Amino acid sequence: HERSSAASDVYKRQGNEIFIIYSNDPRKVNYKQFGIKKATLIDNTGAWTDEEGLNQHIKNPSVERAILTAPAKGKIKNIVYGINDERLKGDEKIVGAASCTTNAITPPLKLIDEAFKIQSGHIETIHAYTNDQNLVDNYHKSDRRGRGAALNLVITDTGAAKAVSDVIPELKGKLTANAIRVPIPNVSLAIMNLNLKKSVGVEELNDLFKQAAFHSNLRTIIDYSNSIDGVSSDFYSNEFACVYDAQATISNFNCVTIYVWYDNEYGYSRQVV
């Protein structure tokens, strides 16, 4: 997240040249002229989410594999780094990296489920608006997203609950999810209301996440915040998949509510890489 300028179709960053290539057909892009071969291509267009569409990249002789930055459909594996990447055998041509929200909520859900067993739950994401929404009221196939994104709180759906169950099969059918798009450009918040098998206190939950953030194999994925005045802008450019907000945790016997922040751009990009 920083300003840059590009006078041509080459963007220079930290001594590297990044070429800006224009094409309407991924099969016909001439990557060879840029010295690109056996490439891993990251598709974040959102144009294709299934094997048929994404195979267009693979048919290009310079592309060896493709990673989708959205929940993949069909038989494509959805992978959240640090959670289920052991499923990768190394011979996959196409892999789905799920979504920014799925990458943010899956690590905390796995952590809590392993410790206390999740019986059911609902996840509400307070999500920065995206380029899928209209800036002024206009037609959109998803009606509410057609309303002005910079002026409204917009209730919309999210596939995060289903995507979580793809990554953690034990949670299949136990979670629901929804989203509220809000008029900020970046950093989102997931609120998880969970019913557990046993009663758990706030201190016990905070200890669980503190240990995970500092002393477990999730320490590069889950961050821990104990700030009493933390707000969304504090987590701009945070490199973790999610940041557990210890001050916001609520417990009512076996019903708990946890809050996790996430930079839905930079934090997710780190997960993809």
Where are these regions (language model features)?
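C-terminal active-site/capping subdomain that shapes the small-molecule cofactor and substrate pocket
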Residues: 177, 189-273
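Hydrophobic alpha-helical hairpins/lids featuring a short glycine-rich hinge
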Residues: 29-58
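Single conserved hydrophobic/aromatic residue that forms the stacking wall/gate
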Residues: 1-7, 11
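Rossmann-fold NAD(P)-binding glycine/threonine-rich loop
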Residues: 47-92
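Short alpha-helices
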Residues: 95-109, 113
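Short glycine-/small-residue-rich Rossmann-like dinucleotide-binding loops
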Residues: 24-25, 45-46, 71, 99
